[in-house]
């Protein structure tokens, strides 16, 4: 059995990714923002089971190709099973991205909810840039956790009783200092891309707003409720003592840890399949163009 964590999270990935984007918005980005009008070769870093390939290939110009890289053997096997039934030119490679160089032959390098798990995201961005040809693009779909947490509304209660934004921000910052991993990396990517030499850097935000509507059809409501719970909204916290000890070890004071536990417990108790809830994931979508570098002899001709 694989020891790689994400090999055991395939169902979670399949059940929650659809919460983030409407298909027409991705089509708008491809056609109107990035202006992709001819076939492109895409490489995705940390591709999982190829979700972004599944979303982008149908709306990219015919003849586009997709290469997915991930160190999860089970994830890559699952991706191969899915894409074997589809008409797209795709390739999946099992590889540890942090240690493997890739040839500079792609038009676009992308990541989706990947850089937040890296202890040195800037190093990975450099590798992404190095795999893209001149005038190609780097596109990063990455989370901004504090914006995510402030973009859900549970009807009938005070939001500050279930979402302690100040404590969460402190917790996220302490985690970054301790591990190097940053769930707020999405808001920082435009700065990093520009500092690394990309031009025409821009950033958009994911469009989808999920509405748990008590007047919607029962099947759709059940599907959405289960996805929201699996995404982490209103999940029941573990044993109080264990949670408190974990929060204390991550840098919170005893008072802050107590408030955070009580907020999570309250959210879990209040959020049911009979709740009215609105949730916008608020993913940041950052992009920039790789500089075209001509050799000296070419410039002189």
Regions found by a protein language model. Give the residues of each.
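Class I SAM-dependent methyltransferase SAM/SAH-binding core
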Residues: 43-45, 49-99
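Acidic carboxylate diad motif detector
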Residues: 140-142
């Amino acid at each position: 059995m694989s020891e790689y964590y994400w090999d055991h999270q395939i169902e979670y990935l399949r059940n929650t990714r659809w919460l983030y984007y409407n298909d027409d918005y991705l089509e708008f980005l491809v056609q109107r923002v990035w202006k992709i009008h001819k076939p492109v070769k895409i490489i995705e870093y940390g591709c999982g089971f190829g979700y972004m390939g599944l979303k982008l290939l149908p709306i990219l110009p015919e003849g586009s190709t997709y290469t997915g890289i991930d160190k999860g053997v089970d994830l890559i096997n699952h991706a191969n099973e899915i894409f074997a039934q589809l008409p797209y030119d795709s390739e999946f490679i099992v590889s540890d991205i942090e240690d493997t160089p890739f040839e500079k032959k792609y038009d676009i390098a992308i990541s989706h909810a990947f850089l937040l798990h890296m202890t040195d995201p800037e190093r990975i961005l450099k590798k992404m840039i190095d795999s893209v040809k001149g005038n190609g693009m780097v596109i990063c779909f990455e989370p901004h956790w504090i914006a995510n947490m402030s973009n859900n509304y549970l009807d009938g209660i005070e939001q500050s009783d279930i979402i302690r934004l100040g404590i969460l921000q402190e917790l996220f910052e302490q985690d970054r200092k301790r591990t190097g991993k940053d769930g707020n990396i999405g808001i920082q990517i435009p700065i990093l891309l520009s500092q690394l030499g990309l031009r025409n850097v821009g950033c958009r935000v994911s469009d989808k707003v999920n509405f748990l509507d008590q007047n919607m059809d029962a099947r759709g409501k059940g599907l959405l409720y289960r996805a929201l719970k699996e995404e982490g909204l209103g999940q029941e916290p573990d044993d109080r003592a264990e949670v408190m000890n974990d929060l204390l070890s991550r840098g919170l004071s005893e008072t802050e840890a107590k408030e955070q536990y009580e907020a999570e417990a309250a959210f879990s108790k209040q959020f049911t399949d009979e709740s009215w809830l609105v949730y916008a994931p608020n993913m940041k979508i950052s992009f920039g163009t790789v500089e075209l570098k001509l050799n000296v002899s070419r410039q002189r001709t």
